[in-house]
Design a protein with these regions (language model features):
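Positively charged n-region of N-terminal signal peptides that target proteins for export
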Residues: 1-5
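Hydrophobic helical h-region of N-terminal Sec-dependent signal peptides
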Residues: 7-15
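Bacterial signal peptide processing site
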Residues: 22-25
Length: 165
């Protein structure tokens, strides 16, 4: 899944780079920031996938990497978005909120050497929701509308974290 994001990023970066000689400074900065985001998230995802489940420090390594990923998502949400990509701003905010909630729930799920399956399920839902929005952002930056994505008129956010009840 992450490889698809990296491929989309390369495509977006190329499109933005070759979009004309008169690129605005704001668009250039945004392009670099998006590229850095995907590079960082890809590196973190690689580290997460390399964790040996039977390792003594697997949980702590996972949680550290998830914290780093959440920080990257927050940086994405804090970016100044050019007018050409204004729809990305709400998606980035939602993605950061979902990732923050996923990290919080994963932390609770593994608290005190007790594993809570329901919290892991809730954390996983929030993680997947964050990644879905990152995919939507990549598609929007290509100038397309994500398939199956709701079209929202006006301002607003749809962040509704899944939490254990």
């Amino acid at each position: 899944m992450l490889k698809r994001y990296v491929l989309i990023l390369v495509t977006i970066t190329s499109m933005l780079f070759f979009s004309g000689c008169g690129e605005k400074e704001e668009l250039t900065v945004f392009k670099e920031q998006i590229s850095n985001f995907y590079t960082e998230v890809s590196a973190i995802e690689t580290e997460i996938n390399a964790i040996a489940e039977d390792s003594e420090n697997a949980v702590s390594t996972l949680l550290i990497n998830m914290e780093q990923m959440s920080e990257q998502f927050q940086k994405l949400a804090d970016l100044e978005v050019p007018a050409e990509f204004v729809s990305v701003e709400d998606l980035a905010d939602d993605a950061a909120s979902y990732m923050y909630e996923a990290v919080r729930l994963y932390g609770e799920a593994y608290e005190d050497d007790y594993v809570s399956d329901s919290l892991i399920q809730a954390a996983s839902y929030n993680y997947e929701s964050a990644m879905k929005r990152i995919n939507y952002i990549a598609i929007l930056l290509q100038g397309e509308i994500p398939e199956g994505a709701p079209v929202i008129e006006g301002d607003g956010t749809e962040f509704e974290p899944y939490v254990e009840e």
